[in-house]
Design a protein with these regions (language model features):
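Glycine-rich phosphate/diphosphate-binding loops that line cofactor/substrate pockets in enzymes
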Residues: 1, 179
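Extreme N-terminal starter segment of soluble prokaryotic enzymes
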Residues: 2-6
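Short, glycine-rich nucleotide/cofactor-binding loops
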Residues: 7-13
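Structural beta-sheet core signal
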Residues: 8, 33-34
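Short glycine-rich anion-binding loops that position phosphate/pyrophosphate groups of nucleotides
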Residues: 13-14, 34
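Short N-terminal binding/cap micro-motifs at the start of the first secondary-structure element
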Residues: 14-19, 41-44
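A short, Lys/Arg-enriched amphipathic alpha-helix followed by its capping loop at the start of a domain
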Residues: 17-30
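Electropositive, gly/pro-rich neighborhoods at or near active sites that engage anionic ligands
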Residues: 36-178
Length: 179
């Protein structure tokens, strides 16, 4: 098994648990993970990639395993300050996690692709596995409800998946090319 290479398609917190199990059998350097980007969202001008980050934090032993997302032992001073400014804070971004989003956004603004930015972030966190976004193009999963179309994260996190789903759309999918 030490020489066997494995590629996994991943998305969401369940994938991190599955891959954590695989990482006990296979060396990290033998694992490639192609990760969902349809849940990515822009918040406060930052590019947030929840599924990529969950996998990256899992491999770097930084993942908050209780929640299944975010960085363990993270603080939320950034969120508290935003709340004082009167901004919505339904999408929880920890202070350490925030550094990831700031750095990723900086790299993307400098012209790096999402694949390149993910490689740089992963290397900085000593991740040996190859983590690849499914595409470098921007895709958004939108949920259509009675009140209109909302981003998947707003549906899942802010509204706790309560509205009745009438349809699901994937904006940008037709222009997306595999990584």
């Amino acid at each position: 098994m030490k020489n066997l290479r494995l590629t996994v398609l991943a998305g969401g917190t369940g994938s991190a648990k599955f891959i954590r199990g695989l990482a006990k059998i296979f060396p990290q350097k033998n694992l490639s993970v192609i990760v969902n980007v349809g849940d990515n969202i822009k918040i406060y001008g930052l590019i947030i990639c929840p599924d990529l980050d969950t996998i990256m934090y899992m491999f770097s032993n930084m993942l908050n395993k209780e929640k299944g997302w975010g960085v363990k032992e993270d603080t939320f001073n950034f969120q508290k300050m935003l709340k004082k400014y009167g901004l919505e804070t339904w999408f929880k971004l920890g202070d350490k996690d925030l550094a990831t989003h700031i750095y990723r956004t900086f790299l993307l603004q400098k012209g790096y692709s999402l694949t390149e930015a993910t490689k740089i972030l992963s290397k900085s966190l000593s991740v040996k596995a190859k983590i690849l976004p499914a595409t470098n193009q921007w895709i958004e999963t939108k949920i259509v409800t009675k009140t209109g179309k909302i981003h998947f994260q707003e549906f899942w996190v802010k509204k706790q998946a309560k509205p009745k789903v009438l349809n699901v759309t994937y904006e940008g999918i037709k222009k997306a090319k595999p990584t």
